[in-house]
Structures are given as C-alpha cells and as structure tokens.
Amino acid sequence: MELEDIRRDYSLGGLRRADLPQAPIELFELWLKQAVEAKLTDPTAMTVATVDKKGQPFQRIVLLKHFDSTGFVFYTNLASRKAQHLEDNSKISLHFPWHPLERQVHITGTAEKLTALENMKYFTSRPKESQIAAWASKQSSRLTARAALEGKYLELKQQFSKGEIPVPKFWGGFRVKIDSIEFWQGGDSRLHDRFLYSKDQDKWVIDRLAP
C-alpha cells in the first residue's frame, strides 16, 4: 500500500494573533460551535491520552460532556484502564481533530475526580439504556464472549425495569484542569498556524509555534 502521495492542501484560512482572545476557552467555544454548525461527525469526540506505571502511553476516543474556565469534563468507569492510570498519574492530554475545518486543539493538564453530586446530575440525565450499560460493563476487563455482556445487560434491564437507576459507585467523571492549550489551523504550503496558551499563575501567556 503506497502512502507517500496521500496528501491535500490546506486552504480554509489562517489564524492570526489579532484573532486571539486573551482566554483560550473563548476560542475553544467558538471553534466547537463552528464544528457543530458544520455538522461534523461527533464534534465533541476527543482523544484522551494517559500513561501507565511503566510510562506506556494509551489513547482512546471519549466524548466531551462539559467545559468552562475550570476545565474539560468526561465520564468513565472508575475501574477502567484510563481511570486506573489517572489514579497513579493525573497528567493527561486531550486532542480534538476537526479535519474538515483543518483544525486541531491539543490540551494538557491534570485530571481531578468530580463530586458525587456532579456525577449524579449527569448520570440521571443519560438515557436509561446508557445507565444500564454503565452497570453492565466492567470496562477494560477481559470478556469470554460478547454474549456474556449482552446477557448481563438484559438481566439488569429487567432488574431496573421500574424506578430510577442508582449511580454505580464505580462510575464517575473527571475534570481536566488546563495547563496548556494549543490551537492549530491548516495553512497554505504547509505554513500552518499554531498558537499555544500556557498558564502562568492567574494569566495566560500566548506563543506562536513554528509549524
């Protein structure tokens, strides 16, 4: 399979320092809004990278569920591989690849667990099928067959057929507190625009990076 000639031009526009707000969350909100308006598939999907005790990195796609000036929020099984990694090392990075808009956003930071109240508020807002699935799946554990998972799901569906479904103790969210956030916009002749916001106490320092 020949890969050398697979490429394309980037021509949707550049990013200039004059376009940048002082707070990166404002630009992220604008870009995410534009990704939604452009009807991109899964615009809130982000790559979440963590490392294990040996320093081996792992990545997976997770959906962003909330963001504001305090950080970026996602939810998971607290016994999952990513959650176990974060117990040992709270350093984390997030990546949003908005290819059709020729944009990327890369975030580094530290992950902190959400409160039980925050977990409950989001869990109860989910469709019932998703709530049951959270109970059924021991995320990242080995399965003998898919039938075992489906059987457990059906068993729990019957068990929780009436009334509210409680929040599993092994399920919850993380808030990624931002250390840095980079905005990448494709440019002509591979002269891409990259701007890095780095946290310096209570203010943001903005640097242009070479493509």
UniProtKB/Swiss-Prot annotation:
Free-text comment on the cofactor: Binds 1 FMN per subunit.
Catalytically driven reaction(s): pyridoxamine 5'-phosphate + O2 + H2O = pyridoxal 5'-phosphate + H2O2 + NH4(+); pyridoxine 5'-phosphate + O2 = pyridoxal 5'-phosphate + H2O2
Binding site for substrate: 7-10, 65, 122, 126, 130, 190-192
Subunit relationships: Homodimer.
EC number(s) stated in the UniProt entry for this protein: 1.4.3.5
Protein name as it appears in the record: Pyridoxine/pyridoxamine 5'-phosphate oxidase
Gene Ontology MF terms: FMN binding; pyridoxamine phosphate oxidase activity
Function: Catalyzes the oxidation of either pyridoxine 5'-phosphate (PNP) or pyridoxamine 5'-phosphate (PMP) into pyridoxal 5'-phosphate (PLP).
List of residues binding FMN: 60-65, 75-76, 81-82, 104, 139-140, 184, 194
Cofactor(s) listed: FMN
Database matches in NCBIfam families: pdxH, PRK05679.1
Keyword list, A-Z: Flavoprotein, FMN, Oxidoreductase, Pyridoxine biosynthesis
Annotated GO biological process: pyridoxine biosynthetic process
Protein origin, superkingdom: Bacteria
Pfam families: PNP_phzG_C, PNPOx_N
Family, similarity comment: Belongs to the pyridoxamine 5'-phosphate oxidase family.
Pathway terms, separated by semicolons: Cofactor metabolism; pyridoxal 5'-phosphate salvage; pyridoxal 5'-phosphate from pyridoxamine 5'-phosphate: step 1/1; Cofactor metabolism; pyridoxal 5'-phosphate salvage; pyridoxal 5'-phosphate from pyridoxine 5'-phosphate: step 1/1
